[in-house]
């Protein structure tokens, strides 16, 4: 096993998870709060940046500067209808930057800061990287990061960039359902060929993939899904329902208050989880809005009615992927549930009914399966030779058809959807008019017949074609998809051998090399800020506990009579003065806390050592720098 462990990271819309393959099995790694999944939340305050649990715990107190759902922004345009509808639910501010890219605007340390979705995602990835490093005790460089199978080219590319900004070498971007299939099928060697349907409904995205698994070979037959459907959408329905109820009962509009809305959302999320195991859930929020308490309840039936169309819509991709895989329902051996939202009984019932009452497979942990599979893939790619993974082969597919625009705005597909990747294909095209000097090659992805209905990935010009009648020049266009599902396109004029190529990266509002460099440096800077903040708090806590310890020492029954009243008063006054100073200078610099501590030590040490010489023995507790609640001390926050 190489010294440097490669990890697998499931970068989720709402929660993320990290795993590592070691000693022949996968370890899912718990974070510093002991949780095996970490909220994909980043918060900015007057003093610090928080990532994960700490960020989510303070969201009600700081709704405008707590960013989540970055995965619903990444690789999308600002005017994407999905982005526009999400913005109505987000308390943080999303603005349109150059190239119509969405960015988030927050206030950090009293200044306005603007971040790309890639940067926010990179902060979550950084947290996962640090979680793994704390567990492994070494630095982590290499990672396999997962994306929804239905993510398009720009979303994949942007996710890869986020990894780079976090200082990770992304070995491979793999599809979430495929990763989950590895988790499911890893121990099923020698069971013959099995057709497995992975139904992955998470916090923000939905995928269905059908694979054939046989002796460690995982071949994806088809994939379908919706990159904008998940638990968050079910929460939204419940939030809207209760907002309307509040308006009816109290004639007040909750939507005008982000904090109230956030507290309601947190309660809805909790109620939704309760409804997966009970038939009714109650919501009790004290002083939700203008001092009004909100006590109400919701039944499972009501919740199912609120989300009925969303639940039903999860069945369409299942049928589509069956059609694409040219498979009958009866040929599916196992239906495997992945993602937290598959715990919803109604979703399970719809799926089971679609397969005429077939039992669903719940053998893998729906929250951890994706990170588990990613960790296995990371081990393989970094050359792990252990028996569990050595014969494993992954054959994934391109989720969307890829092609170019030909005369009349027609989409001519070179690579059909569900083609196994990596793949390379070439086709020869010609000019449309006489003596045409160049051709514009426009690359699209999507299933519609006309390019205007599909997604433009990028375009480039092949110029310098020698004059010739239309139809004579031969231009060979080559599409090449790598194992990450990212596309390279080249065009060659056969008569002159002139070539031009692009990795589909430009036009996409994709980050340039310079942008990434700059963001990597900024990420380092923010990390240094976080460290400095930790040291500062450490110095503050150290001073505070030293002052309290000193006071306790001089109050000690055994020592009371060994210390002169004036010495005792000196120390008491100084301690009180310092504790008072601390109260009014919570935000002082580390050096100031250290200076105050030196000051106090200077006064106390001679008195204390005099004391112990007379009493004999070493001083308890109040040794200089008695940092009881030191740098790693817990900070306690109220959670709604």
UniProtKB/Swiss-Prot annotation:
| PROSITE patterns with a match to the protein in the record | HSP70_1, HSP70_2, HSP70_3
Q: What kind of modification does the protein receive after translation?
A: AMPylated by fic-1.
Which keywords does this chain's UniProt record carry?
A: ATP-binding, Nucleotide-binding, Stress response
- SS bond list: none
A GO term, aspect molecular function? heat shock protein binding
Instruction: Locate the compositionally biased regions of type Gly residues.
Output: 623-633
Give the multimer and partner information: Interacts with E3 ubiquitin-protein ligase chn-1.
Entry protein name: Heat shock protein hsp-1
Q: Which organism is it from?
A: Caenorhabditis elegans
State the gene name recorded for this protein. hsp-1
